[in-house]
Amino acid sequence: YKNLAKNEKGGKENSKEKSYENDNEIESNATLVTEDINSNILQIIYFDFDKSELSSISKKEIKKFLEKYENVISKFLIVGHTDTKGTKEYNYKLSIERANVVKNLLIDLRIKEENIKILGKGEIDLNIKTNDEVPHPANRRAEISPIN
């Protein structure tokens, strides 16, 4: 089991040991790489508040992820998520945008579109439970999982 978070500046943090109290405590567009066969989620990409753009470090990490698993995984599920800030409808659309951004990068990296499924969950399935309208960076993410 490997759990590693990299921030924009290239530093490393153990994501399981730190809780983020506000938006400023997690660096912009951090990428969490997990390798846990039991979790089935192999890559988590975090997003800035109200954004769906990938940082250059996130793009590099996704590329490394694909290179590592290119002979093992051929089909992918990308699930987009948001925090609870904003309306449920807006957050659902944003979660779809986040999943699509990751999907488009996978296509650019030569994964066939028919081998990628996306799902938007909006503010359902939060990593960190919060009250409505409370932003939390750990909830703003897209998860990449293999499809068997």
Enumerate the language-model features and the residues they cover.
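Periplasmic OmpA-like peptidoglycan-binding domain that tethers envelope proteins to the cell wall
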Residues: 59, 81-148
